Structures are given as structure tokens and as C-alpha cells.
């Protein structure tokens, strides 16, 4: 049977910045040859708010409320790295109780982050049910945050240089344990609903494969890196906070496709529950903030009756000075390595505040993954990367 050959010009398609599966204001200029993706150019910057410049015109205490807006699905990680950098630069110690409370909050945030990835990713694939289920569990996490910090999703403003803003309220620990006991069977329910569904597996298995070498060369981090066979987790590598006190495993896969990234994130939620339970069981007493962290640099030492005498308060002063020096601090957020490069100049303001977001680096590999794929795979591969545009654009 004779076939009629049809040759068409490549079609340029704009996806976003208001497409529901763009996960924010991301615009993709996709060049298509029929159903095949020839090229893809991400256009970013629609959510740029000058967060680095704002940081350089604020003290650390003033800047903490701003940082939840980078990755607004996981604001606690932003706060953690914002206070970790000045702490490392000035050598401010964090009390054991404060460190345990931080770990509990960060792991709750990791679960909330993965849930907010899980629902929309499955909605992109075509499974609507889990999208509504995950809101139920995230609501419980937000209730815990509201009780401890006074706020729910973003702008918790809970982390402080040298500790946390307030101790855990009475009864909070019991509520958190109740959530942990409730949540583990829920993950099993999700897995039963989704993981072995033949339609779901055909949709994501073998799609968007990243080799081990590619993952390292592109500078990927977090689940994107661990799904490609690299067992790298900053909680184990950098030994920050008190993660060494707990028994938990780094979750990783070798396939490097969308299914591997899904599997890593689902397992990480179980590990987070394991860490939270251990942290609550071993929660030490003592202060929740460093009462000796009076100022990062006391400035001029003067006589007690002199005009410029600096009174020493119990908490970190809003006008403390950053010591001269530079530091790179990083934490393992739900999306990967979130880092701050900080240069202090013996001033109340940092001289340079460089944010290294995980999803900005992870997003770079998207055009490489999309070339040669079908147009239906675009939203699947993008969804598996887990990007939040507030963090990408800053």
C-alpha cells in the first residue's frame, strides 16, 4: 500500500507561563515536529523579586521573614540555611534541644514538600484522586506548624540565629507522634493506589532517563541525583544539625527515570517519619536558643559609662555585626542542595548573599531530557523534576 509522505514545518508552541502543569510561572518554548519534541527553551524570571539584593540591605534577623518566599512549598529549609550561614561564620553554637526541634520541623517540611510534589505530578500524569488525598495530610502538618510557630504554610519565621523563636507548646509532641502513626499507613495506601497501576507505570517508566554521569555533570542534587544511582545526601555528608544522632538510610535508585524519582521521594517520606519519631523520643531538655549569642561581633569595647557602651541582651541583637570572612552553608531540602554563599564585612548587613537553589540547577537539564520525546511526556518529565518558580527566580 502506497504511503503519502507528508513533511511539515516545525511548530513552535508556547507552554506557560500560565499553563496549569508549569508549576508556577515557567514558560517553555517547545519546537515540535508533529508529536516529537525537537527543542525546548525554558524562559524563567517571571517571579524574580531581587531576594539576594534585599538580603544585602537587611540584617539577618530582619531578613528571616522574607525567605519563605523562595521555595514557598518548603519555607523551613530556607529559614534553616538563612540562620546556618551566620552561625557558621560567627561560630554561634546551637543548643541540643533547639537542634532537635529544627530537625523535627525540617522533616515535617520534607514530607509536606513531597506531598505537594506527589499530588500535582500525578495530576499531570492523569491520576486525579491522589491530588485531593495529599491535601488532607498536609493540612495536619500545617496544624502542627500553626501550633508551634503561629503560621501555616509560609512565613513561619521560626528559626533564629542560635536556636528557634519559641519552645514547643504543651501537647505538641503527642500530636506530632499521632500524625506519624497515622501517616505511615497512608503512604502504603498511596503506594497501593498508584505505584503498581499499569497505566501509571507505562506513563513514567523509562521516561526522562538520566545516567549517573549526566546527573553529576549537570550538577543535580536531591532526589534527582539519588534516583540516578548517586548515594549523596547532605544530611549524611555534612553532618549538620543533629542528624548523626538518628538511625536512618539514604534512599536511592539506579534507573534514573521518572519512576525512580517517584520511588525515591515516596521512600524519603517514610525515612522522615522515622527521623521525627527518634527526635521526639530523644528530645533533650534545656534552652531552645543560645542565650550567650549576644552579638556576632561586639564591636568597640568601651567603658560602662561611655556614650557608645553596647548593652548585652540575652538574645541575638537585631543590630549584630557579621564578622569579616566568607562561608558556604547548605542544607538538604526536599528538592536538593539549598546553599547560601555569605561574605561578611564586619557590618550589620552582609556584603554578599548568594542563594544556590536546588531546583534552578535541576531545571537546567530539562531541554536535554525533552529532545526526542513526545509532547505528552513534557509535563511528566517537568513534573518529576519538582520545580518551584519562587526558588528558581528568587
Curated annotation (Swiss-Prot):
EC number(s) reported in the record: 7.1.1.-
Residues in coiled coil: none
Cellular compartments per GO CC: plasma membrane-derived thylakoid membrane
Principal EC category: translocase
Biological process annotations from GO: photosynthesis, light reaction
Keywords assigned: Membrane, NAD, NADP, Plastoquinone, Quinone, Thylakoid, Translocase, Transport
Family, as annotated: Belongs to the complex I 49 kDa subunit family.
Protein name, entry field: NAD(P)H-quinone oxidoreductase subunit H
Organism: Nostoc sp. (strain PCC 7120 / SAG 25.82 / UTEX 2576)
Gene for this chain: ndhH
Amino acid at each position: 500500500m502506497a504511503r503519502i509522505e507528508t513533511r511539515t514545518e516545525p511548530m513552535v508552541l508556547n507552554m506557560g507561563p500560565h499553563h496549569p502543569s508549569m508549576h508556577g510561572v515557567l514558560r517553555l518554548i517547545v519546537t515540535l515536529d508533529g508529536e516529537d519534541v525537537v527543542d525546548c527553551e525554558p524562559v524563567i524570571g517571571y517571579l524574580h523579586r531581587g531576594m539576594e539584593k534585599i538580603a544585602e540591605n537587611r540584617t539577618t534577623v530582619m531578613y528571616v521573614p522574607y525567605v519563605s518566599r523562595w521555595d514557598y512549598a518548603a519555607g523551613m529549609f530556607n529559614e534553616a540555611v538563612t540562620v546556618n550561614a551566620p552561625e557558621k561564620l560567627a561560630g554561634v553554637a546551637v543548643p541540643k534541644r533547639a537542634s532537635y526541634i529544627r530537625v523535627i520541623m525540617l522533616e515535617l517540611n520534607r514530607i509536606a514538600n513531597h506531598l505537594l510534589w506527589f499530588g500535582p505530578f500525578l495530576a499531570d500524569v492523569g491520576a486525579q484522586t491522589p491530588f485531593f488525598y495529599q491535601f488532607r495530610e498536609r493540612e495536619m502538618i500545617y496544624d502542627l506548624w500553626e501550633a508551634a510557630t503561629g503560621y501555616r504554610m509560609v512565613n513561619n519565621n521560626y528559626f533564629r540565629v542560635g536556636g528557634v523563636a519559641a519552645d514547643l507548646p504543651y501537647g505538641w509532641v503527642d500530636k506530632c507522634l499521632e500524625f506519624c502513626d497515622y501517616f505511615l499507613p497512608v503512604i502504603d495506601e498511596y503506594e497501593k493506589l498508584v505505584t503498581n497501576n499499569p497505566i501509571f507505570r507505562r506513563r513514567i517508566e523509562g521516561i526522562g532517563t538520566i545516567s549517573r554521569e549526566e546527573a553529576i555533570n549537570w550538577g543535580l542534587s536531591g532526589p534527582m541525583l539519588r534516583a540516578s544511582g548517586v548515594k549523596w545526601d547532605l544530611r549524611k555528608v555534612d553532618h549538620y544539625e543533629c542528624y548523626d544522632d538518628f538511625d536512618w538510610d539514604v534512599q536511592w535508585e539506579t534507573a534514573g527515570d521518572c519512576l525512580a524519582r517517584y520511588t525515591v521521594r515516596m521512600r524519603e517520606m517514610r525515612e522522615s517519619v522515622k527521623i521525627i519519631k527518634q527526635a521526639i523520643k530523644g528530645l533533650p531538655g534545656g534552652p531552645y536558643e543560645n542565650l550567650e549569642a549576644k552579638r556576632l561581633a561586639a564591636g568597640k569595647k568601651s567603658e560602662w559609662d561611655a556614650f557608645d557602651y553596647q548593652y548585652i541582651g540575652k538574645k541575638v541583637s537585631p543590630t549584630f555585626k557579621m564578622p569579616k570572612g566568607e562561608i558556604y552553608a547548605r542544607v538538604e531540602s526536599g528538592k536538593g542542595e539549598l546553599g547560601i554563599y555569605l561574605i561578611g564585612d564586619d557590618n550589620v548587613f552582609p556584603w554578599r548573599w548568594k542563594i544556590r537553589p536546588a531546583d534552578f540547577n535541576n531545571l537546567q537539564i530539562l531541554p536535554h531530557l525533552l529532545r526526542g520525546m513526545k509532547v505528552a511526556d513534557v509535563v511528566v518529565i517537568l513534573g518529576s523534576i519538582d520545580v518551584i518558580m519562587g526558588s528558581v527566580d528568587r
